[in-house]
Amino acid sequence: MNILVTFDNNYLEHALNMLLSLKRYNDNLTIHIIYDDLSIESINKLKEFFEKNNIGNLKLYYQQSDKDVSVIETDYITKSCYLRLYAPYIIEGVDRILYLDPDIICQGTLEGLYNMDLDSKPIAACENMLREEVKYLRELMLEHILMPKDAIYVNSGVLLIDIDKYKESLTIDQLNNFLRDKSQFLDYHDQDALNFLFYKKIKFIDNTYNYQINAVDSGKEDLNKIIIHYSESTKPWKKDYPWPNKAIPYYEFLKYKREN
């Protein structure tokens, strides 16, 4: 399987944790990492981690962010998040690739997801999940990027991408121009861009492969999902995380921290 990950120095340890969980259930991995802000120290640590844990093949791509694209950054959204949108123009010799956010945990094989029929669509993704008390935001999320109220807004944390179909649907010039002209209106950053640019071109998949646990009301979480995604700004490695670590599937993070 060809897996795509993008992150910066701040998310290195969390990405390594995700890869540990991925490797536990999946073999024959080639991990493609596109970056614009990884130090030499981080890259060396990454290479040592791959060798020590026998993760798979590692391919690194340095891609400098477009200086003309002024994106809004937060403590968990940086320019590196936008690199996933450029992956099909950077990675060669691959027909499809599975993008995974570094803030997820894998709890099973991803073969079924990776090999699914995309029905001639360039992307497969899961609907963005919202807690009951904030579901009114759904229409606002669609409205601010000029999408119909009945459209399905997807989460960009797990994306199965057909490389050729993606490039047929969107040229790199179109992507550059869109981000250059519209980035200030993208409240949800690269996720907004993906939804707007690929409207009606996305195959929708079950949230088994992208269970956004922070969007579930407390006490109603279903932890028997293949991918648990700690989306939004609340993360289990932060001190203010509302649930005890032992009660959630994030033990690999603690294991990695203890052993390294």
Question: Language-model features: where?
Answer:
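A recurrent flexible, glycine/aromatic-enriched loop bordering the glycosyltransferase active site
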Residues: 146-158
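Acidic donor-binding segment of Leloir-type glycosyltransferases
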Residues: 30, 34-62
